[in-house]
Amino acid sequence: MSSVSEVNVDIKDFLMSINLEQYLLHFHESGFTTVKDCAAINDSLLQKIGISPTGHRRRILKQLQIILSKMQDIPIYANVHKTKKNDDPSKDYHVPSSDQNICIELSNSGSVQTSSPPQLETVRKNLEDSDASVERSQYPQSDDKLSPPKRDFPTAEEPHLNLGSLNDSLFGSDNIKIESLITKKTVDHTVEEQQTEKVKLITENLSKLPNADSECLSFVGCSTSGTNSGNGTNGLLEGSPPSPFFKFQGEMIVNDLYVPSSPILAPVRSRSKLVSRPSRSFLLRHRPVPEIPGSTKGVSGSYFRERRNVATSTEKSVAWQNSNEENSSSIFPYGETFLFQRLENSKKRSIKNEFLTQGEALKGEAATATNSFIIKSSIYDNRKEKISEDKVEDIWIPREDKNNFLIDTASESEYSTVEECFQSLRRKNSKASKSRTQKALILDSVNRHSYPLSSTSGNADSSAVSSQAISPYACFYGASAKKVKSGWLDKLSPQGKRMFQKRWVKFDGLSISYYNNEKEMYSKGIIPLSAISTVRVQGDNKFEVVTTQRTFVFRVEKEEERNDWISILLNALKSQSLTSQSQAVVTPEKCGYLELRGYKAKIFTVLSGNSVWLCKNEQDFKSGLGITIIPMNVANVKQVDRTVKQSFEIITPYRSFSFTAETEKEKQDWIEAVQQSIAETLSDYEVAEKIWFNESNRSCADCKAPDPDWASINLCVVICKKCAGQHRSLGPKDSKVRSLKMDASIWSNELIELFIVIGNKRANDFWAGNLQKDEELHMDSPVEKRKNFITQKYKEGKFRKTLLASLTKEELNKALCAAVVKPDVLETMALLFSGADVMCATGDPVHSTPYLLAKKAGQSLQMEFLYHNKFSDFPQHDIHSEGVLSQESSQSTFLCDFLYQAPSAASKLSSEKKLLEETNKKWCVLEGGFLSYYENDKSTTPNGTININEVICLAIHKEDFYLNTGPIFIFEIYLPSERVFLFGAETSQAQRKWTEAIAKHFVPLFAENLTEADYDLIGQLFYKDCHALDQWRKGWFAMDKSSLHFCLQMQEVQGDRMHLRRLQELTISTMVQNGEKLDVLLLVEKGRTLYIHGHTKLDFTVWHTAIEKAAGTDGNALQDQQLSKNDVPIIVNSCIAFVTQYGLGCKYIYQKNGDPLHISELLESFKKDARSFKLRAGKHQLEDVTAVLKSFLSDIDDALLTKELYPYWISALDTQDDKERIKKYGAFIRSLPGVNRATLAAIIEHLYRVQKCSEINHMNAHNLALVFSSCLFQTKGQTSEEVNVIEDLINNYVEIFEVKEDQVKQMDIENSFITKWKDTQVSQAGDLLIEVYVERKEPDCSIIIRISPVMEAEELTNDILAIKNIIPTKGDIWATFEVIENEELERPLHYKENVLEQVLRWSSLAEPGSAYLVVKRFLTADTIKHCSDRSTLGSIKEGILKIKEEPSKILSGNKFQDRYFVLRDGFLFLYKDVKSSKHDKMFSLSSMKFYRGVKKKMKPPTSWGLTAYSEKHHWHLCCDSSRTQTEWMTSIFIAQHEYDIWPPAGKERKRSITKNPKIGGLPLIPIQHEGNATLARKNIESARAELERLRLSEKCDKESVDSSLKERASMVAHCLEHKDDKLRNRPRKHRSFNCLEDTEPEAPLGQPKGHKGLKTLRKTEDRNSKATLDSDHKLPSRVIEELNVVLQRSRTLPKELQDEQILK
């Protein structure tokens, strides 16, 4: 075939020839229609057009390289000579000489084409001319193309391939051996056009051997020979039969070269029916010794083995051999092999099962490149026998690439044939470029060349060649082995101090690599020979290896050793220069910079072919310099769970390489690329290609996916990877899944032939004979559907043919015994999978099983099928009697199978790990209500027996546990004797089968509906309910996900259930019964109460754990949350209730942000157990609770309003009529799921309530909609349409949800009660008396003032200044300061800071009585202004301060230490020193308080300090001067409040809203009625006792005082709401207030006036001692005591005044 015709092949035919026709559309879309168009295609271009699998790209590039190479050179042809056995054993055999050799090749249509190469060297001058002519075929001839003749070849539909009949059909009565040897020569195009030659086929007929089973066909190829006197092309075979085989017809030519030298040999060969040929020893003794070629190089056999292992599609030629003769290589007229194998190795080679077709015979890559459909039905044997290395292969070799072949290993000089030389060339050139080792790609390696003998003397033309005579015993001598050398050398380091370092250096003929020691497998550096410019001597026993990038300097101990190294390297360079070729350019699959553990800088990593190269940088890679190579054939890749998420490891037996990518995507790309390379390295396409010979095997038997590469070897179906995963779930007994590409050892010749004979089409005729069109499985079907389909198809036999259903078991067995002795395997398969017993009795005492019958009959395929189904047990199936069978099976259950069984656990459950370790496989039998387990299936005595009627609980574990043998599916059996039996099945189906059978035995009939549920737990419990709380009864319960099904005795209802996520209460308690403690579980759901307890502690623990888990939160879906009785998640109900109680009067409540840490803690608490978690005022902040509600609504799996309805909600806004729009909203809400509908109603009701109080909280419907629109719709941003929808829902809540009028009125009443405390009377009732000092703490400078719960520091400051009649000047700034710790620490309060909240926090101080407030001038105001002005310019405060921590966490020791501080962006950073780049600590200024000063007990080194307070830690800082202290304090103050440090200029001064801030006016707190004297007296005594305790311990009760202000205010409000109007409006003032109002600040302490007032008060109390007041009219004493603890401090006030304050 001409090269032009090959490259013009249509791309479709080309892709079909390599089994990649699925990419036809990709090529057409990219403009590639013929092979010629693909001349410039490369790997990256293939990726761009959409071919992603690396193996497919390699295959395409490989075949394109082979075809396109013929555009540059004309192919080299070969002469083939064979001998034929004549009827007359004494007849001479001879081979005539041929001036021209004819090569037979495949054309596009599958025909054979001949070409006439130039005349080659004459073999012998005087050879007899043969008068015999080629027997001509009757096929027509067309265009000089030769097609193989037709032959009836068994197709996939035929039941069996009979080797004997096949032999006859191919070659008539004689077995024919055809061997070919193709010798390649370079040919001139002009000579080729001028010469034509007749084709003569020389064959060799062998008579039948005695044992046919030990023989195989070896159809290797056709050899051509002829004379000049032929008739041109008339002798060509004609026609285009479809079969790949053709029957050779022609007369054999005898060559006297092979006439036996002794007449004694003839009879021997006649008896053995062998071709007579000289012995090997004779040939060796008489061979001429030719001249040794000057520059030839040998090829080692190890390389051939490596190529054979790596090749993805093997096409081997197997020579016909005789088992009675030693395995000698064929002797050809143009060459001879002198590398013989040992006799014993030859005898080991078995050719019993080899069945070769033309696909094995024509070994030319041209046959693959063109569209010849080569039927690859040859079966190869994977037994561990050595394959001969004299296999002959054909190749087209371009002239410029003749020498460009890579040799991986060096060997000693050897003899070889010319043909073996070309065999090595073929293997080198035909291998895909990506299959070469990357080392050879990057290195411009020294190539080992094999030259034909005709070219050893130079570049001779064809005429010169033809004039030379070639000896029939010409030998090829391989070149001497490459010099390799290794040893210890000193290498000069390239960087740093440039010191010599000892390295183990190796030179392997291709590159220099150096290691830390001789045991390491991975080098520290590689210097390829191609990168070396020269090697030169340097003084002191040193030599240099010079490359373009750098010069490597090595030093040795002796000069002789240095000279040896230099000599070896220079010789290698010289050899390279003589044979150098252009470097192969291959685009790497993946390259880039990665971090490699152990290296500081990033490493340039390259993945190409089956290796990963590590280089220092990209330039080194381009130059060929590298660090090391990681071969993929021994590697594995996995992700690494470290702090760096982008890490992965390549693991080899010798070392693990840990890489880190920059992004997660890059890491995944690398892992995927490496995994693909590993898979391609280990894959072998040979088995797949042979099995795909049957066209039906090219699509998955289950889902029709193309090119399936997995198979179930016992079911005889070829399946895809997705279906293979589901086949494994059936268990190895029902489906044995194996890979076509990687499980090579399992694929024997018989097994491959079995798959070819049956095929997916014929297999599906049985398995899917009743499959309907709508029940078919598709490629993209989900996993669950795929699993169900495969289970129904193979396990249940739902779709299989039922033609044999009428047969009984005995009849099926008889039919099976009759079928196995015939070649029809399909019949055997149908019988076996229809219920026949594979181990049934045959009636033959010797051949007692069907397998032995098949062996007796010599049916190897039947034997193979029965062998892989020896454990199969497919039940007899009848669709029509299915109901009857199931009914009978329910009444009498019998099961037997191997199960994993663990020893029974007594008194308590063993650990899971221990149970799994003690698990052993047992033969289990369930029969007659007893479960017995045996040591094995042959044992007669059981190891144990379980009475199923005694079972009280059966637990099923849906998760699979893993043993060394694989996953197992566990179920547990509990007995009243506190024994637990654990069993494990290999599949989930087997687990369900056993548990259903066991449950039917111990669950009574009235509760059998429980067994219909998909339960995880089923059994018997004792219960009590509201119908009978006096005694315990027995009931049957089953757990199904989150539902508890139960059937209770004494109830007419057959069954009921509890929704466990709706439980209002789930608690466990202990009671005593009959002297024993009993654990009882209480379940309350919507008014139904159920008490349960178990028979034993073990089974109760199982039930309690399962119920508690099912009742908890399971996922982020709304329906998976713990629900209230109204189907509203408990977390939503709790947040709504808390905000309603404490937040209706809070301004902008839903627009405030909470603390992220507190929010996450609350969410986690609710998720853990929302039912038992309670929100508490004081402990949980309002802002955190509102944020939790918004976060929950935003994070659920689907939006509350559902994303599916989103367009409908938005489109409703187009309706202008309000009533119509409201109707649409109602319709949308009714279409929501039940939980969504109930939750939405609760949310909108709450928002409606909040907006009703918008005058107080400023949260109208629009503001609420702005907040909640993104939460309810779960959109990233806010749109006006979403806001309008939510606003509509809030405003029209009553109409949309059809709320009744009385419910609306009730809501208004509740709102009024909740918000009433915000009125003037309520607000004043919550005021407290506080002593505030002016400028200094002196008795005459104090003022007792009323502090309201909402008073800010600015109000307090202005009120004090007004009382004192102080008018600040223009430059003065007054502020309120907080002074604590005995006046050692003070800080200014921000003008917006709440005063009362700060005062209440004093309770946490060590000495709360020493704290007070003082109003004075802000002396550092000028400094603050100055700092503020400088700060606007972007300055950052920094400096060295001395710090001490309390308690010590960061700092070591208990002394002040120098640290470097930086104040920036609202944070204070602490560094170890000025040079540190990473901070040790970061302080958030917003969460801390900074005081001026340091406590003396800290022993500060200076008197200028600052103290920082957080919730749990204190930090003490010391400055070196007062100015530094002031600068730091002011800078921190400014940073804390973001420059908003005083009220804006020109703004009206803010004053208190009360009538008179000084004592007087309305009551400060509720006054006790005179009639309640007894209670008041008790309160006074209690307060005095508390005061005494305070004075003794100087500590207050932190827990009671730490309550929030709003909780106390709400209590005060509650008291006032129920107070009688008459009493509340009484204008009379308490005498104590009159006393206080008249008291001047200057009055001396201890004045008798106070005593008089106190006496008057006591008289009034005595006078009204009998009067009583309703409890709702008094303030709880607890509140008085708590507030009093804060107010009572060590201050000098009259005792009478203190008593009066206590009373208040």
Swiss-Prot record:
Zn finger limits (C4-type): 700-723
SMART domains the UniProt entry points to: ArfGap, PH, RhoGAP, SAM
Subcellular location: Cytoplasm
Name of the protein in question: Arf-GAP with Rho-GAP domain, ANK repeat and PH domain-containing protein 2
Matching Pfam families: ArfGap, PH, RA, RhoGAP, SAM_1
Purpose of the protein: Phosphatidylinositol 3,4,5-trisphosphate-dependent GTPase-activating protein that modulates actin cytoskeleton remodeling by regulating ARF and RHO family members. Is activated by phosphatidylinositol 3,4,5-trisphosphate (PtdIns(3,4,5)P3) binding. Can be activated by phosphatidylinositol 3,4-bisphosphate (PtdIns(3,4,5)P2) binding, albeit with lower efficiency.
Organism in which the protein naturally occurs: Homo sapiens (Human)
GO cellular component: cytoplasm
GO molecular function list: GTPase activator activity; phosphatidylinositol-3,4,5-trisphosphate binding; zinc ion binding
Phosphoserine PTM positions: 1632
Record keyword Secreted present: no
Site (Arginine finger): 1151
Gene designation: ARAP2
